[in-house]
Amino acid sequence: MILKTFQNHSILGAIFFGIFVAPSFSDEKETKSKANSDVKKAFIDGTGQGWRELTGEDFVNVNCDPKTWTWDGGHASCTGNPVGVIRMKKPTKNFELVCEWMHKKHAGNSGIFAWASPASIEKLTAGKGRLPDGIEVQVLDLGYETNWEKNKGEPSDWFTSHGDVFPTGPAKMKPFPPVAPNGKRSFPTKRLTRGINEWNHYYIRAINGEVRLWVNGEEVSGGTNCEPAEGYLCLESEGSPIEFKNIRLRILP
C-alpha cells in the first residue's frame, strides 16, 4: 500500500514536472536556438558554380609603384608603400567576393573598395590624390585600435578593427547598425578579426546598391542605398605590408 501510494505520487509528480517544468527547459532551448539562428553565418570559399580565381592578370596598377604589389598565382603581397590602389580591369556592379588577408605588421591598415567611382580612378591615374571615392570595406589590424586607445587614453568612437564598411569622399551609403557617431560607418555587430600574422576570411556581397560583409564566417556589417552602386573593385596599399590569397569573384546579374 505504501509502495503503491508512493508510485501514484511519483507518477503524478512526473506528470506535474513534465507539464510545468519541462516547458521552461524547452523555452530556454528555443530561445538559444533563435538567438543562434539570428546570426547569419556563411563560410563561403568561392568554389561553386560561377566563381573564378583572381590573379595579378585581373588587376591594373592605378597609382602604386611597380614593386608595391607582387603576385604568385592568386597570392598577392603588398609592401604598403606608397599609399594607393590597384583595380580590376573592368568595372563591376553585382558580385560576390571571397578572400583571405593577413597583416604582416602591427597596426597595419588596408582596405577593399567594392565600388570605386571611375571618375575618382581617373584622377588618381593623373596623379591627383591617393585613394578613390567609393564604398570601402576596412581591412585593419587589431593593433591599430590598440595604439589609438593607448595614445588617446580611451576607446575609439569612429572606427573599429573588425570590419567597418563606409563611403569615402562624396560617395553615399545608409549604414547598417550599429552606426558610428558620424552616421556614415557601419560598425560590426561582433568582433571577429584575428591578429597579426593570422589569416582572416572575408565574404563580401554587393548587389543593387547594398553591401554586406561576413568576417570569418559571420555577417557583421554593411549598408544600403550606396552611391556609386557600380565601379571598380580595388585592393588598397596603405602604409604597411599585407598579403591576400584565395581571392575569388562571382559576377551576378
State where each predicted segment sits:
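Bacterial N-terminal signal peptides that target proteins for export
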Residues: 2-12
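Bacterial N-terminal signal peptides
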Residues: 12-20
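Carbohydrate-interacting regions of secretory-pathway proteins
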Residues: 27-253
